[in-house]
């Protein structure tokens, strides 16, 4: 990544640079992946000037050009894999949850979506030898489901699993939680997460996991009826691309939980469908469908992936956390 300062970009003076930083565009890379209209509004400049600044940023950060497949393959080696803590689940995911991607967990209430999210928030802090990414966590909580007590239980579970002394307090200090009160606030928190991630990166505690639990709760409550659908999807599209951008900028896993609905015209098969429509379907890199089974058992199905076949894994949600069945 380039170390060019914002002020060094053509057309960006100290005043413009300050406005960009206030809006969360702290690096040349962040400017390079912005849209001209977004930058123009933020910095109070014309769109043509914004487009020139973005082009300069892309050249400085070496972003946005064409490259050959072998170079893409080489760059893919930087992608990390975060263990789920379950062998069968990891194997289905090709080694774990990928960085620089959005992984969607959808299912009915009680299917284990929030439990998986909590487990990942613990696992990501482990070293790479134990399947972690040595990173911090940011959680955008829309339904007040984050429970520090559950994190403590899971850390104790890992202590027993690996025979290590792990301090739950230390794990909790590396989890940064913000409660989102409406959809606008939820989108704004992604910008705040970018600022926080930049600060933590400088402190040597890079963010390797961003969780949104749950993605659609506020959008469903605020946009009721077909007449509001276009506005909702437009706003949701912006939100999803903000999450994708975060994953790319910080080489982080982005995990979103999602609610479901029953499709009334489905006469055969499972009528359960994730909400959010095609916007979420196209933007999520991996889609996982969680279902309840007997007792602690949960069935996790990989429904969509650009590189992996469909598959199922059976896990157990126990007091100690997510384990193999």
Swiss-Prot record:
ATP binds at residues 107-114. InterPro entries: AAA+_ATPase (IPR003593), DNA_recomb/repair_Rad51_C (IPR013632), DNA_recomb/repair_RadA (IPR011938), DNA_recomb/repair_RecA-like (IPR016467), DNA_repair_Rad51/TF_NusA_a-hlx (IPR010995), Hlx-hairpin-Hlx_DNA-bd_motif (IPR003583), P-loop_NTPase (IPR027417), RecA_ATP-bd (IPR020588). GO terms for molecular function: ATP binding; ATP hydrolysis activity; ATP-dependent DNA damage sensor activity; damaged DNA binding. Keywords: ATP-binding, DNA damage, DNA recombination, DNA-binding, Nucleotide-binding. PROSITE patterns: RECA_2 (PS50162), RECA_3 (PS50163). SUPFAM superfamilies: P-loop containing nucleoside triphosphate hydrolases, Rad51 N-terminal domain-like. Pfam families: HHH_5, Rad51. The keyword DNA damage applies. The keyword ATP-binding applies. One of its GO terms (biological process) is DNA recombination. Involved in DNA repair and in homologous recombination. Binds and assemble on single-stranded DNA to form a nucleoprotein filament. Hydrolyzes ATP in a ssDNA-dependent manner and promotes DNA strand exchange between homologous DNA molecules. Belongs to the eukaryotic RecA-like protein family. HAMAP family: RadA_arch. This is DNA repair and recombination protein RadA. It comes from Methanosarcina acetivorans (strain ATCC 35395 / DSM 2834 / JCM 12185 / C2A).
